[in-house]
Amino acid sequence: MTLSKDSDIYRLIDARAGRVTPQIYIDPELYQLELERIFGRCWLFLAHQSQIPNPGDFFNTYMGEDSVVVVRQKNGSVKAFLNQCRHRSMRVCYADSGNTRAFTCPYHGWSYGVDGRLIDVPLEACAYPHGLCKEQWGLQEVPCVENYKGLIFGNWDTTAPSLIDYLGDMAWYLDGVLDRREGGTEVIGGVQKWLINCNWKLPAEQFAGDQYHALFSHASAVQVLSVKDGDDKKALGADQTSRPVWETAKDAVQFAQNGHGCGFFLTEKPDANVWVDGAVARYYRETYAEAEQRLGKVRALRLAGHNNIFPTLSWLNGTATMRVWHPRGPDQVEVWAFCIADKAASPEVKAAFENSATRAFGPAGFLEQDDSENWVEIQKVLRGYKARNSTLCMEMRLGQERVRDDGIPGVTNYVFSETVARGMYQRWADLLTSETWDEIEEKSRVYQQELVK
């Protein structure tokens, strides 16, 4: 398609009516605009602070399709740089992570300090007899880097709102993972990486707001693992949770704001996640009192939930998997998944967390495979001309949004709804059609007000 004006984008997504045209998942022109206006100016997750604890530690990642290296400085601060030599655009760092005193380009040998300064140019005197202003040719620095309770984010846009303002009420939900115990969290093990042939918005939307698929897409896993109270055989250990949470929950909530979203069940027991090892379920019971003191009852009990910070940072409560959906064109995403656990947990519990996350949501995880097949098959369908120009229904519980009076913040709906999907694509369209953050925020404010008027 050819984008000539903003109305061409809003024609593809009508959040107020619950309509979406699947061209948004496949069009290469839209994808290039996303790289510029979403990945070029939204806050993007870079690394967990535990992955770069010491001066000189670095972690290689992406902001959209731009390779970025995140580095711990000598003074303890964190900087991030475009992984691009200023001479001929070669990467200066190929290692996934490590510790270094300098980054040296393998093409012509230009070297940069961990602070990004150009510190050495081979044969400088004879190659540049007129002189070379090295101060001018340091690595391009990501201008905005902030840390939220251990999660390091970056943003190319200096006019963007602060990270805490960008997160909004989503920070309240995020704290349920990051702030359960004194000492915060850390990454356990390495990063698992794999490719899925689908558009990045499909998994981001599902993690943000789709509990609806679980009973159907994951039916076999539910049947095998969701043991009932009194059952003797528990596939994941003697202390495994003894019922599917959706059978016993007293309520269920979906939250949406500014493209972010999550969904969860309100439970009465601190082990309500059927996908984790018995050792993990037991750990949640044993540490519940501390979590409730720090977070309150709702978040301390919130152990079966799905979440996404727009655009591409997702996690699952209880299961301890956190992942980033790195876009690789309009029809492919590179998944980076890692296990995040309480730093205060014992080594045995951390190992159980890692086992649970890998078994369910690693590249060969029994739930991950269900999800990936859905996304890949959707992308295949959208190769067709008629299919990608059709209209899809996004009306679930349209008009049922509300603001709760029980302390759960933000615009909410029942967990089986598409409030999050509508809000995510409204934010997507607002970002693509707005020149400034003032415009983006005003459009979001108007949309949020309409939901609960």
Curated annotation (Swiss-Prot):
It comes from Photorhabdus laumondii subsp. laumondii (strain DSM 15139 / CIP 105565 / TT01). This is 3-phenylpropionate/cinnamic acid dioxygenase subunit alpha. GO terms for biological process: 3-phenylpropionate catabolic process. Fe cation binds at residues 213, 218. Part of the multicomponent 3-phenylpropionate dioxygenase. Converts 3-phenylpropionic acid (PP) and cinnamic acid (CI) into 3-phenylpropionate-dihydrodiol (PP-dihydrodiol) and cinnamic acid-dihydrodiol (CI-dihydrodiol), respectively. InterPro entries: 3PPDioc_HcaE, HcaE, RHO_NdoB-like_C, Rieske_2Fe-2S, Rieske_2Fe-2S_sf, Ring_hydroxy_dOase_asu_C_dom, Rng_hydr_dOase-A. CDD domains: RHO_alpha_C_NDO-like. [2Fe-2S] cluster binds at residues 85, 87, 105, 108.
